[in-house]
Amino acid sequence: MTENNAKKEQVHTVFQNISSKYDRLNNIISFEQHKVWRKHVMKDMHVKVGSKALDVCCGTADWTIALSKAVGAHGEVTGLDFSENMLEVGKEKTKHMNNIHLVHGDAMNLPFEDNSFDYVTIGFGLRNVPDYLVALKEMNRVLKPGGMIVCLETSQPTMPVFKQVYKLYFKFVMPVFGKLFAKSKEEYEWLQQSTFDFPDKDKLKQLFEQAGFNKIKIRSFTGGVAAMHLGYKQKSSTK
C-alpha cells in the first residue's frame, strides 16, 4: 500500500468513526470559534446570488449550508466528502434545502467537469488529504476561469504567546477531548498530528500558487491558529 493510500484509509476510518460526534467535538475543540471564522470568511467572499459552488471535504455540511443560504434558491451548492457516515449526518441537516446536493468522492479526483463552479471551498479538510497540491490542482480544474477558491484551515501561530498556548493545548487538552469522543487512541492522535503536520500560511500560499491560483489573500484568525487563503483561477486569455 502506498503512503497516500495508507493515509486515505486512516482518514476514512477516523471520520467514519467520529461522524456522529464530529459537530460537538468541533465546537468544543475550537471553543465554537470555527463558526466565527467561517462568518468572517463568508463576508470576504461576497458570494453572488444564483451562483454555483462546490464545498470539498464538506463533512457534516456546515459550510455547505452557509453557501446554500448565500447563493439563494436559484443557486446550487454541491458538497463532496470521502466519508459516507459524515455525509449521512450532512444529509440529515440539509434534507429540507433544495439547492444542496451531497456526493461521495475524493478531493484528489473530483468527479466534475472542468470549469464547472464559480466558487470552491474547503474547510478544515485539506490537512486530511494525502497530497495537498493534487487536491488544489483538482479544485483549480473544476473552477470556472476567474472563479474563487477559499480554504479555511488550522495554521501555525506566529505570535509567541499564542504559539506556546497552542502547543500546550494540543499536548495536554486535546488528548482529553479525544479520549472522550474518539473510539481509539489512533483517532485522536490523528486529529493532533494532521494539525501539526499542516503547512504554515506562507507555505500554503506557495502551494496555491503552484496549483495555478493568483491574487491570493491570507487572513489569520485568533493569533494565527486558523487562516483563510482566498484566491482566483486565472481568467481565460482573450485573443
Swiss-Prot record:
Pfam families: Ubie_methyltran. Its EC number is 2.1.1.163. Pathway: Quinol/quinone metabolism; menaquinone biosynthesis; menaquinol from 1,4-dihydroxy-2-naphthoate: step 2/2. GO terms for biological process: menaquinone biosynthetic process; methylation. PANTHER family: 2-METHOXY-6-POLYPRENYL-1,4-BENZOQUINOL METHYLASE, MITOCHONDRIAL, METHYLTRANSFERASE. Belongs to the class I-like SAM-binding methyltransferase superfamily. MenG/UbiE family. This is Demethylmenaquinone methyltransferase. It comes from Staphylococcus haemolyticus (strain JCSC1435). The lineage of its organism: Bacteria, Bacillati, Bacillota, Bacilli, Bacillales. The gene is menG.
